[in-house]
Design a protein with these regions (language model features):
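Active-site acidic/histidine proton-transfer and metal-coordination neighborhood
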Residues: 65-131
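N-terminal pre-domain/capping segments
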Residues: 1-71, 75
Length: 131
Protein backbone atom coordinates (compact mmCIF):
# COMPACT_ATOMS: atom_id res chain seq x y z
CA UNK A 1 0.00 0.00 0.00
CA UNK A 2 1.40 3.39 -0.91
CA UNK A 3 1.96 6.09 1.69
CA UNK A 4 -0.79 8.20 0.11
CA UNK A 5 -3.30 5.35 0.27
CA UNK A 6 -2.31 4.57 3.86
CA UNK A 7 -2.73 8.19 4.92
CA UNK A 8 -6.14 8.35 3.22
CA UNK A 9 -7.21 5.25 5.10
CA UNK A 10 -5.83 6.56 8.39
CA UNK A 11 -7.66 9.88 7.95
CA UNK A 12 -10.93 8.18 7.07
CA UNK A 13 -10.73 5.78 10.01
CA UNK A 14 -9.62 8.49 12.47
CA UNK A 15 -12.73 10.51 11.61
CA UNK A 16 -15.02 7.49 12.03
CA UNK A 17 -16.92 5.94 14.88
CA UNK A 18 -17.71 2.27 15.51
CA UNK A 19 -20.85 0.88 13.91
CA UNK A 20 -23.09 -1.72 15.45
CA UNK A 21 -23.01 -4.14 12.52
CA UNK A 22 -21.62 -7.61 12.09
CA UNK A 23 -19.42 -8.17 9.04
CA UNK A 24 -20.34 -11.35 7.18
CA UNK A 25 -18.98 -13.41 4.32
CA UNK A 26 -21.68 -14.28 1.80
CA UNK A 27 -21.41 -17.26 -0.52
CA UNK A 28 -22.21 -16.38 -4.12
CA UNK A 29 -24.01 -19.68 -4.66
CA UNK A 30 -26.49 -18.66 -1.92
CA UNK A 31 -27.52 -15.55 -3.86
CA UNK A 32 -30.75 -16.09 -5.75
CA UNK A 33 -29.67 -13.60 -8.41
CA UNK A 34 -27.18 -10.87 -9.22
CA UNK A 35 -29.96 -8.63 -10.56
CA UNK A 36 -29.87 -5.13 -9.05
CA UNK A 37 -33.44 -5.37 -7.71
CA UNK A 38 -32.64 -8.58 -5.82
CA UNK A 39 -29.33 -7.20 -4.52
CA UNK A 40 -30.99 -3.95 -3.41
CA UNK A 41 -33.58 -5.88 -1.39
CA UNK A 42 -30.96 -8.22 0.07
CA UNK A 43 -28.73 -5.31 1.08
CA UNK A 44 -31.66 -3.64 2.82
CA UNK A 45 -32.68 -6.84 4.60
CA UNK A 46 -29.10 -7.51 5.74
CA UNK A 47 -28.80 -3.96 7.09
CA UNK A 48 -32.11 -4.29 8.93
CA UNK A 49 -30.74 -7.40 10.66
CA UNK A 50 -27.44 -5.69 11.55
CA UNK A 51 -25.23 -7.38 8.95
CA UNK A 52 -22.73 -5.82 6.55
CA UNK A 53 -21.36 -7.94 3.71
CA UNK A 54 -17.57 -7.82 3.99
CA UNK A 55 -16.65 -10.58 1.54
CA UNK A 56 -18.41 -12.40 -1.26
CA UNK A 57 -16.95 -15.88 -1.78
CA UNK A 58 -17.36 -17.80 -5.03
CA UNK A 59 -16.22 -21.12 -6.38
CA UNK A 60 -14.94 -21.27 -9.96
CA UNK A 61 -14.22 -24.16 -12.30
CA UNK A 62 -12.18 -23.77 -15.43
CA UNK A 63 -12.18 -27.52 -16.06
CA UNK A 64 -12.75 -27.47 -19.80
CA UNK A 65 -10.02 -26.62 -22.31
CA UNK A 66 -12.38 -24.34 -24.24
CA UNK A 67 -12.20 -20.58 -24.72
CA UNK A 68 -15.98 -20.23 -24.74
CA UNK A 69 -16.39 -22.06 -21.41
CA UNK A 70 -13.52 -20.05 -19.88
CA UNK A 71 -15.21 -16.83 -21.00
CA UNK A 72 -18.58 -18.00 -19.67
CA UNK A 73 -17.06 -18.65 -16.22
CA UNK A 74 -15.19 -15.31 -16.32
CA UNK A 75 -18.47 -13.53 -17.15
CA UNK A 76 -20.17 -15.23 -14.19
CA UNK A 77 -17.34 -14.08 -11.90
CA UNK A 78 -17.62 -10.55 -13.29
CA UNK A 79 -21.29 -10.57 -12.26
CA UNK A 80 -20.21 -11.63 -8.78
CA UNK A 81 -17.69 -8.77 -8.57
CA UNK A 82 -20.43 -6.34 -9.57
CA UNK A 83 -22.75 -7.88 -6.97
CA UNK A 84 -20.10 -7.48 -4.27
CA UNK A 85 -19.67 -3.82 -5.15
CA UNK A 86 -23.44 -3.30 -5.15
CA UNK A 87 -23.76 -4.96 -1.73
CA UNK A 88 -20.90 -2.89 -0.31
CA UNK A 89 -18.55 -5.84 0.19
CA UNK A 90 -14.91 -4.85 -0.05
CA UNK A 91 -13.56 -8.22 -1.10
CA UNK A 92 -14.32 -11.08 -3.46
CA UNK A 93 -12.60 -14.39 -2.81
CA UNK A 94 -12.62 -16.89 -5.68
CA UNK A 95 -11.86 -20.52 -4.88
CA UNK A 96 -10.66 -22.06 -8.15
CA UNK A 97 -11.25 -25.81 -8.00
CA UNK A 98 -10.21 -26.88 -11.50
CA UNK A 99 -8.02 -25.49 -14.27
CA UNK A 100 -7.68 -27.27 -17.60
CA UNK A 101 -5.45 -24.68 -19.30
CA UNK A 102 -3.68 -22.02 -17.25
CA UNK A 103 -2.81 -20.04 -20.39
CA UNK A 104 -6.55 -19.39 -20.91
CA UNK A 105 -7.45 -18.86 -17.25
CA UNK A 106 -4.70 -16.47 -16.12
CA UNK A 107 -5.64 -13.67 -18.58
CA UNK A 108 -9.31 -14.07 -17.65
CA UNK A 109 -8.48 -13.73 -13.95
CA UNK A 110 -6.19 -10.76 -14.63
CA UNK A 111 -9.05 -9.01 -16.43
CA UNK A 112 -11.32 -9.88 -13.51
CA UNK A 113 -8.83 -8.33 -11.10
CA UNK A 114 -8.81 -5.12 -13.17
CA UNK A 115 -12.63 -5.07 -13.12
CA UNK A 116 -12.63 -5.58 -9.36
CA UNK A 117 -10.27 -2.62 -8.91
CA UNK A 118 -12.55 -0.43 -11.03
CA UNK A 119 -15.51 -1.53 -8.90
CA UNK A 120 -13.61 -0.72 -5.68
CA UNK A 121 -13.39 -4.35 -4.63
CA UNK A 122 -10.31 -6.35 -3.66
CA UNK A 123 -9.98 -9.72 -5.42
CA UNK A 124 -8.21 -12.74 -4.02
CA UNK A 125 -7.88 -16.02 -5.89
CA UNK A 126 -7.22 -19.30 -4.12
CA UNK A 127 -6.39 -22.58 -5.81
CA UNK A 128 -4.13 -23.93 -8.53
CA UNK A 129 -3.85 -20.64 -10.44
CA UNK A 130 -2.90 -17.15 -9.29
CA UNK A 131 -3.47 -13.61 -10.46
Amino acid sequence: MSTTAASRVERAVAASSPADVEPVTLTASALESTAPSYLRDLKSELAAEGYQPATLRAEARFGEDCSIETQREADRLRDIVRAASFLGAGRVTVDVTAVADESRVEPALSALEERAQREGVSLSVEGPVAV
